[in-house]
Amino acid sequence: MEISWGRAMWRNFLGQSPDWYKLALLVFLIVNPFIFLANPFIAGWLLVAEFIFTLAMALKCYPLLPGGLLAIEAVIIGMTSAAHVREEVAANLEVLLLLMFMVAGIYFMKQLLLFIFTRLLLSIRSKMVLSLAFCVAAAFLSAFLDALTVVAVVISVAVGFYGIYHRVASSRGEENDMLDDSHIDPHYKTVLEQFRGFLRSLMMHAGVGTALGGVMTMVGEPQNLIIAKAAGWHFGDFFLRMSPVTVPVLVCGLLTCMLVEKMRWFGYGETLPEKVRDVLQQFDDQSRKKRTRQDKIKLIVQAIIGVWLVTALALHLAEVGLIGLSVIILATALTGVTDEHAIGKAFTESLPFTALLTVFFSIVAVIIDQHLFAPIIQFVLQASEHAQLTLFYLFNGLLSSISDNVFVGTIYINEAKAAMENGAISLKQFELLAVAINTGTNLPSVATPNGQAAFLFLLTSALAPLIRLSYGRMVWMALPYTIVLTLIGLLCVEFTLAPATEWMTQAGWLATLS
């Protein structure tokens, strides 16, 4: 017997999501207008909490759908306007270009990356050394590339590793579905679970590595560039001014990487199963035997494009997204990828997240229109100069862990600059606050996927369900890093930032905003 119209509509609404999740979203959509009529400020914070809930439940339903419904309702009931949403999207166009083109550009360099990381994986047997290598590599790359780009690289490598073993374990060859474990016998499943744990730990080490490296340079994160422009700093100035905080944090972050692997804490310490190593070794041997001169030329071309990518980003020759577009054009033209459908596959990973980030900008518009952060900013600026550094750092960290760190950094640096221009704080204090804002925005935000766009990208990627990386597990695995990075950063802001900056200024190393 065919189901009723109502039942059919309920099943279609958010598809396979659990009934309790669908019901929760309906409750949100029903109560929001009434709360907004009663108290817009409370309604604004409630909307932020609801959006965070949809992100936390990313594996139940992709957040674009429920988050998008909440955003549409927010515009309809007047929490913000469509014009303001457009302004936020326009202001963050370079971030969207980055997602659309840079992430897709990396897709066409996967052969080279898989080759390099396979050699790295097979040549380093110590899990601690391998984890450290992934963390250091991610940190170094993130100093020149955006963290999203680096995470996209590591995701593509991990999916490649996983796919190689899953094909062997399922005995289904090229027709293998990586999400389907039904054809894998119990023995292989045990090994597969261990392999998942191994990949989870590598992904988290690499993800945190992007935060460690990304905070150090003005091109490491989008908000870094905004803060550098506001303070009038160039590449070298930015690096030196951040170094009293970022260098100790980097050292302690790498020590944390070694400690959690050694002690097998927080889900770390899983080693690469020998059976998987053998499969990957065989794959590598076969790949090398089958590699034709044409294939070798492709690898060389991809390596040259990689050099162009790092050089263009380091010298900031163009916007990051446009450099990514140049990578797509060069990589496809010089490696013979000419079919539209083959090129289209490169965009399947990044475009859903681009749409999700656009939805997020509408939530940002609500935050601005409802002045949700105003009480916090007023409270901080009323404190003493020394306390301001600590408070800016802590409030940036708190808000960045639940909100977009680009937005938080932008709001705070604009408020700090306005305070300087109005005479509320000195130029010297503003420059110290800029460091506190940048480090506070970047370091504590590793606590949750909400704060780091790279973490959110990982959580909502095709890899997350393969290696069973949920929101809760990601928060748990990030916890030791969150504690160490936040505390060391706070201590450095409190005790080393001002004297180290004063010393570098007297030595003539630092430029000052005129």
UniProtKB/Swiss-Prot annotation:
Record protein name field: Na(+)/H(+) antiporter NhaB
Transmembrane parts of this sequence: 23-43, 63-83, 97-117, 120-140, 144-164, 202-222, 238-258, 303-323, 357-377, 391-411, 447-467, 475-495
Primary localisation category: membrane
Keyword tags: Antiport, Cell inner membrane, Cell membrane, Ion transport, Membrane, Sodium, Sodium transport, Transmembrane, Transmembrane helix, Transport
Cellular component terms per the entry's GO annotation: plasma membrane
Domain of life (superkingdom): Bacteria
Membrane topology term: Multi-pass membrane protein
Molecular function in Gene Ontology: sodium:proton antiporter activity
